[in-house]
Amino acid sequence: MRVLGLFERGNNLNFADTYVYTWNKQYSFHENAFLISNQVATTIIIYLDKEIVNQVNEAFNLLNSNGIPALIIKSDHIGIFTSSNFTYDWQNKIIYFHEYTYYKNNEFIVSDEFWLNTSIQDLLPYKVLFFERGLRKLYEGEEYILYNTATDDDIIYKYIYEKDVIMSGNDYSKLYDTKSFKNFVHFMRLLRMRFAVPFDQLSNRVTRSRAFAKSKIHIGLRNESIPQALDNIHHYWINYSANGMRVSELKGSGSYSEKKISEFDIGQFKNYMNFLTLMFYIKNMKKKPSCTIIGAAPGYWIPSMKKYFNIVTYDDKHVDSTEHYNRYFTDDDIASVKTNGVYIDVRSDFKNYDWKKRRQLVEEETMRWLSITYKLLENRYVEAVLLKMTAMDIEIPDGYFVHFPTTYRKSEYYLLVDKQTVKRPKIKITKSLAYGAINTIFSDNVFISGKYSLKGKTEGVLALYCLSNTINPKEKVVQYANSFSGTCMTVRLNNTYILNKIIDFKTNADYTFLPSDFQCSIKTVLTSYRGYAGVFGYAITKDLKSDGNNHIYIIPNARDDDNFDTFASHLGLSRYSHSKRFSESATTMSGYLFRDMVSGKENMEDTDTENLASGHVFNAIAHYRFDYTYDIVGWLKLHKMRKFRVKSNIYGEHTDDEIRNAIEAAYVYYLLDGDEVGKEYAKRIMEIWDVQTWG
C-alpha cells in the first residue's frame, strides 16, 4: 500500500487498483489517516490544496511512522510510484524502488565492480552495469531522492551455489537444452517476472542499516549484512554467527575430483570473500582490522575496500591498494608487517612439471608458507592469518576451514588461524580427509564466530532472523525475549495451521511463535516487518502474505508513552476484513453481526453503531496471519492498566465486556474454521487479558 499526495489533477486513474480518497474536512487528521489506511486499494491518491495540506501532512506523518508510505509527489512521477514497490526513508525523504523495469533495456546490474572484469559480459546478451551498493539514482530534487535498488546479484550467487540443483530440475530441463550461464540467467529472470521479485531481501538491505548502527552485538550475521558491517567498521561491535567449521570437525574422505564451478572467473569473488572473512574475524577481537595481502594481483575488489581498511599488498604486478610493494614477499619482510591481518594467496606456476613433481612442489610451497604464517603470528602486530593450503597429509593448527567457491574446484582450501590457535595442539589431517571436505563443503558466510549464549545482559543486541533456530530450546528463547532490552530481535511467526509447528530447512529447523507467547516489558513493541520499518524511520509498500516467511519483531523501548498510535497501531488493521467482507460475505455488516451474535445480542437494529465487541481487538486476533502489525498484546495490557494514551479525538475506552466479547468472537471464528492455532491464540490472548489487573 502507498498513499500519494498530488497538487496537480490529471489522468491518474489509469492504474489498476487505485483509489482517489476525498479528504474529509469534518474529520481530524487521525480519523482521515485511519480511513485512508483501511482502503483495500494498493494505491491511494489524495488531491491537495493549500487549505488541507497541513492536515494531510500530519496524517502522512502518522501513516509513515506506522510503516505505510505516504508522501507528496511530483505529478510526472506518478507512473513509477504506482507501478513499483518501494521502501521509503521518511526521515530523510529517500525512496528506494525495488523494480526490474531495466530488463526491458537489456541490462544486467551488479553491485560489486569486480564482476566487470570477468567474461560475464561476453556470456550474456545484456549490457552489464555496476552501481555501488546497487543504488541507481533516478532523480534528486528538493522534494526527495529516488533510487532503484534492484540488481541481479542474487542470480549470480544462486548460479555459484545452487546452479546444479536448479539446472537439474524438471522445469529447467523442459525449457532449455543446455546448462549454460546464459540460460540460467534467463530462467531466473522468468521466475522473477512470475511475481517473484525479492522485495523482502531488497527492502531489508535498506532498513537494517539503522538498526545495525544502533547495535553493539550482532547475532546471526550473514553476507547480506556486509554493507552495514563495512559502514560501521570503525565503530565498536562484535558478532556471534555460530558459523565456521574447524579442522577438527571435518569428517569423511575423498580423492582428487576436479570440477568447473563457473563459466566465468569467480576467483575475484573467492578472494573478496576470503578477505572479508579475515577482516570480520579480526573485528571480533575488538580491533580495527587491517590487512597485508601476499599475492594480491589482480585484486579488482581492493580499490573499493581502501576506504574501510588499510591494505598493504605484495605482488610483482601492480595493485591499487593503500600501499603496494611491486615484488614478492620474503622472510625478510615478516618483521616489517604492521597490519593485524595477513592474507596469503600464493601459488607458483609449476605447469611445466609432470603431475608428481608438481604435487611435490605445491606441498613444499604450502609448508613454506605455513612456516611463514607461524613467524607472522609471532609478530606483535599480526593477530590472524588466512593462508592457502592444499590437500596433503599434514599436521596443522585447529583453525577454521575456509572454502569459498572459485572457478575450478581442485585441491585447494584456506586455513584461518590466530595467535591462540597456533598455541594449541595441532591436528593431523590426511589428504583423503582434505579432499572429502574440498569436494563437499563450500563456505557461504564471511562472518565466523562462536555460538551466542542466551544469557546475560542484552543491551545493544541485534538478532534478526536467527533465534528461532532449534539450536536453542524454545522456552529459553521465550525467556530471553521477555527480558530482552537490545535493539531488536525476531522470532518466526506461526502462520501455519499446526500447533507448535517446527519448520524444517536443508540444514536446520525453526520453532514458530505467536505474539501471545511473550511477556515483555510494556515499553516493548511486538509487530510485523511493516511495524518494525516504521519504528526505524522507514515505510514499505508491500502487504504481508498470510503464508509467507514472516517474523515477529520484538523492539524494546519503542513505545511512545504519550501516543500509542505512533508505532504499530491499528492503522491498516481492517484492510483484510474489508476485502473479505466485500468479496466473500453475505453482507458488508457481517463482521458486526457475527461479533454481536457470539456476544448473545438479540436485537440487531443498532449493531453497526452500538456493537457489543471491539472490532479492532477481533480483527487483530482473527486475522493475525494477514496483518499482525498492530501490537495487540501491548494494547490490551495498557488498556487494562489504564495507562493507554493516544493523541486522537476518535478514541473511546472499551469496557471489559467489549474486549471479552471480541476475544470470544475470534475464538468462535477459528472454531468454525477448524483452526487449532487460531483457537490457541485467542485462548492465550484471553489469558493475557484476565491476568492483567485494572489500573
Swiss-Prot record:
HAMAP family: Rota_VP3 (MF_04124). The keyword Hydrolase does not apply. InterPro entries: VP3_Rotav. This is Protein VP3. Residues 256-432 are annotated as: 2'-O-methyltransferase activity. It comes from the Viruses. It catalyses: a 5'-end diphospho-ribonucleoside in mRNA + GTP + H(+) = a 5'-end (5'-triphosphoguanosine)-ribonucleoside in mRNA + diphosphate; a 5'-end (5'-triphosphoguanosine)-ribonucleoside in mRNA + S-adenosyl-L-methionine = a 5'-end (N(7)-methyl 5'-triphosphoguanosine)-ribonucleoside in mRNA + S-adenosyl-L-homocysteine. GO terms for biological process: viral process. Its main location: virion. It is an enzyme of class 2 (transferase). Residues 187-255, 433-559 are annotated as: N7-methyltransferase activity. Multifunctional enzyme involved in mRNA capping. Catalyzes the formation of the 5' cap structure on the viral plus-strand transcripts. Specifically binds to GTP and displays guanylyltransferase and methyltransferase activities. Has affinity for ssRNA but not for dsRNA. Capping activity is non-specific and caps RNAs that initiate with either a G or an A residue. Together with VP1 polymerase, forms a VP1-VP3 complex positioned near the channels situated at each of the five-fold vertices of the core. It is found in: Virion. PROSITE patterns: SAM_MT56_VP3 (PS51589). Signal peptide: none annotated. Belongs to the rotavirus VP3 family. Its EC number is 2.7.7.50, 2.1.1.56. Residues 560-695 are annotated as: GTase/RTPase activity. Pfam families: Rotavirus_VP3.
